[in-house]
């Protein structure tokens, strides 16, 4: 079995203090996201989405953050997917942004719900046409016999909509995660990392430092 216990490194890129934080976790996240984009780290909008079914059994996958606003975090998916089915059963979810190259991570706990048709449509029409076609071609999370069959379905849809716009599927759309708790983590020397948690208190947020 491969040995893992000696794989480690020091965290040297700097600390995080309370007076550096915005009063709003959304504003603080926007600052960190802008810095992640500017740093040209790979896939800065990639986030781990954790859901659970009605029995509490969890699942995770990486999805892309496609919109950030004052209300929360928006992603898109097939409504028949496992994640969508689990959100329908139990709407509490968790997001995680692992920005390893910046020695940072952000965790978000909140409630997911579908966004409006108009909001979904606005995003869908902005997608590349092949991505629009892929939304139609894939019955996400369902068993499929081969990749060849998937490509056949894709090509059939592509032919169908070759001379016109691709309509928005009624089985595809967006979710917004409204945060109730957000944690910002900055790596520190000697494993003395800096952690700050925002917790919603009515219309405001309480901020506390956590032990690493």
Swiss-Prot record:
Pathway: Cofactor metabolism; pyridoxal 5'-phosphate salvage; pyridoxal 5'-phosphate from pyridoxamine 5'-phosphate: step 1/1; Cofactor metabolism; pyridoxal 5'-phosphate salvage; pyridoxal 5'-phosphate from pyridoxine 5'-phosphate: step 1/1. InterPro entries: Pyridox_Oxase, Pyridox_Oxase_CS, Pyridox_Oxase_N, Pyridoxamine_oxidase_dimer_C, Split_barrel_FMN-bd. GO terms for molecular function: FMN binding; pyridoxamine phosphate oxidase activity. Its EC number is 1.4.3.5. Its cofactor is FMN. Binds 1 FMN per subunit. FMN binds at residues 61-66, 76-77, 82-83, 105, 140-141, 185, 195. It catalyses: pyridoxamine 5'-phosphate + O2 + H2O = pyridoxal 5'-phosphate + H2O2 + NH4(+); pyridoxine 5'-phosphate + O2 = pyridoxal 5'-phosphate + H2O2. Pfam families: PNP_phzG_C (PF10590), PNPOx_N (PF01243). Substrate binds at residues 8-11, 66, 123, 127, 131, 191-193. Coiled coil: none annotated. Keywords: Flavoprotein, FMN, Oxidoreductase, Pyridoxine biosynthesis. SUPFAM superfamilies: FMN-binding split barrel (SSF50475). One of its GO terms (biological process) is pyridoxine biosynthetic process. Catalyzes the oxidation of either pyridoxine 5'-phosphate (PNP) or pyridoxamine 5'-phosphate (PMP) into pyridoxal 5'-phosphate (PLP). Belongs to the pyridoxamine 5'-phosphate oxidase family. PANTHER family: PYRIDOXINE-5'-PHOSPHATE OXIDASE, PYRIDOXINE-5-PHOSPHATE OXIDASE. Homodimer. This is Pyridoxine/pyridoxamine 5'-phosphate oxidase. It comes from Saccharophagus degradans (strain 2-40 / ATCC 43961 / DSM 17024).
């Amino acid at each position: 079995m491969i040995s893992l216990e000696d794989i480690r490194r020091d965290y040297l890129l700097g600390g995080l203090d309370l007076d550096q934080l915005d009063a709003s976790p959304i504003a603080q996240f926007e600052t960190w996201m802008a810095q992640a984009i500017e740093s040209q780290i790979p896939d800065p909008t990639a986030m781990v989405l954790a859901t659970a079914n009605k029995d509490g059994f969890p699942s995770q996958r990486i999805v892309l953050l496609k919109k950030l606003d004052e209300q929360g975090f928006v992603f898109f998916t097939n409504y028949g997917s496992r994640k969508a089915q689990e959100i329908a059963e139990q709407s509490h979810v968790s997001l995680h942004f692992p920005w390893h190259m910046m020695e940072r991570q952000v965790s978000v706990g909140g409630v997911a719900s579908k966004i409006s048709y108009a909001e979904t449509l606005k995003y869908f029409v902005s997608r590349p046409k092949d991505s629009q076609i892929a939304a139609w071609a894939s019955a996400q999370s369902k068993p499929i016999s081969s990749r060849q069959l998937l490509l056949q379905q894709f090509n059939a849809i592509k032919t169908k909509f070759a001379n016109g716009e691709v309509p928005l599927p009624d089985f595809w759309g967006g979710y917004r995660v409204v945060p109730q708790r957000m944690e910002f983590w900055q790596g520190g020397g000697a494993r003395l990392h800096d952690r700050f948690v925002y917790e919603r208190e009515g219309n405001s947020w309480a901020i506390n430092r956590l032990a690493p």
